[in-house]
A protein has these predicted regions:
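Short, well-ordered beta-strand elements
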Residues: 119-129, 183-185, 205-208, 255-257, ...
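Gly/Pro-rich hinge or "lid" segments in bacterial periplasmic/extracellular proteins
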Residues: 158-162, 262-339, 343
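Aromatic- and charge-enriched surface segment that lines or borders ligand/interaction sites
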Residues: 173-221, 256
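Secretory targeting signatures
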Residues: 1-20, 51-52
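Surface-exposed binding/hinge segments that line
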Residues: 187, 221-290, 320
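N-terminal lobe/hinge region of extracytoplasmic solute-binding protein
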Residues: 125-179, 309-310
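Short, disulfide-bonded extracellular cysteine-rich repeat modules
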Residues: 38-47, 72-80
Length: 347
């Protein structure tokens, strides 16, 4: 009897048990999660995973014309335009005009900015404003800094990498000297164009050097650099006789000049900016009182570095004196390669 009584006290009845489990989905990341469930019943369902976003397709090469900075995967669509050489060959052949050539060259050669560490535009604080952009009457450094970017010479000064200066060829491809040391015969590049598309030839060089003597550089007197070496007739624009006995135009790419006396420094003198080559036809077209007492030898026109006057890498877009000067590329520039600066402001 004792055993039966103890059993009844310890076991209790079935109706007297604890709370029943609440069945349901107990996983919080399930779409049917039940926060009240105390026991998982295997019914959890889950949302379909979000699909991976499609990568942005496009040209990923910063050097291409159609570079897409947002592109993640290259789609082989990169366009580099036609080469400088091919465009200029078509221009020389007359297949395309100046407008088309300029457009294609800009597309092909322009700087493409790749973030703040590779800007295509720079602003430079100058030591002072240029006095003129006429290379045949400029002697100051501020003018020279601009002139060297707009006009070119047969030879120029350059560094040799060790701190010494050397002279390297630019518009000339070479020269020879007669046995008596008096006559220099130059050969010129045949692929040089002024910024307006006119082709440069030997008569432009003769005209330019004789203009220095004819105009006389009244403000700077820089003309003495050439005056000591040779003379001309009167730089009146007659390409057949303007050089007088000193000059001979042999062909479009060759001419000779005879000096007063042998000079080992002659190449050095013509490497200075006073030896720059200008567009003879445009200068003649813009002379004031040509042949008269007030002949300006196109100085008023040349003073601000007009379009078409030079053959170097840049042209003057804007010049507000004592404020700013803006240089932009001469897309017709003869050296191959792309530009790393599309706009150079000097202020």
């Amino acid at each position: 009897m004792i055993a039966s009584a103890l059993a009844g006290c310890l076991g209790g009845s079935d109706d007297d048990g604890g709370d029943e489990d609440v069945m349901g989905c107990t996983y919080a990341d399930a779409t049917n999660y039940n926060p009240d469930a105390t026991k998982d019943d295997g019914t959890c369902t889950y949302a379909e995973p979000e699909p991976e976003p499609e990568p942005v397709m496009g040209c990923t090469d910063p050097a291409a014309n159609n570079h897409n900075a947002a592109a993640e995967v290259d789609d082989a669509s990169c366009d580099y335009g036609r080469s400088h050489a091919d465009i200029m060959a078509d221009y020389a052949a007359g297949t395309i005009d100046f407008g088309q050539a300029s457009y294609e060259l800009e597309v092909s050669r322009k700087c493409r900015e790749q973030g703040s560490n590779n800007p295509c535009e720079i602003v430079e604080m100058s030591i002072g404003d240029a006095s003129t952009i006429d290379p045949h009457d400029a002697y100051d450094s501020a003018s020279g800094d601009v002139i060297e970017q707009v006009y070119d010479t047969l030879y120029r000064y350059a560094g040799d990498g060790t701190g010494n200066a050397i002279i390297e060829s630019r518009l000339a491809t070479g020269y020879s000297v007669s046995e008596d040391g008096l006559t220099y015969t130059f050969t010129l590049r045949d692929d040089v164009y002024f910024s307006n598309g006119d082709k440069m030839d030997a008569s432009d060089v003769v005209y330019s050097w004789c203009r220095v003597l004819g105009y006389g550089s009244p403000d700077s007197h820089v003309g003495w650099i050439l005056e000591q070496s040779f003379d001309c007739n009167d730089a009146d624009g007659n390409h057949d006789d303007m050089g007088g006995a000193s000059f001979s135009v042999i062909s479009d790419t060759s001419f000779s000049v005879t000096l007063f006396a042998p000079s080992s420094a002659f190449i050095s003198t013509i490497a200075y900016t006073v030896g720059a080559v200008i567009n003879a036809d445009l200068c003649e077209a813009n002379r004031v009182d040509a042949g008269g007492e007030n002949d300006d030898y196109c100085h008023e026109w040349m003073d601000e570095g007009p379009m078409g006057a030079g053959t170097n890498a840049y042209t003057v877009q804007t010049w507000v004196r004592e404020d700013r000067l803006v240089l932009v590329p001469n897309w017709m520039y003869w050296e191959s390669g792309d530009y790393n600066i599309n706009r150079h402001t000097v202020s």
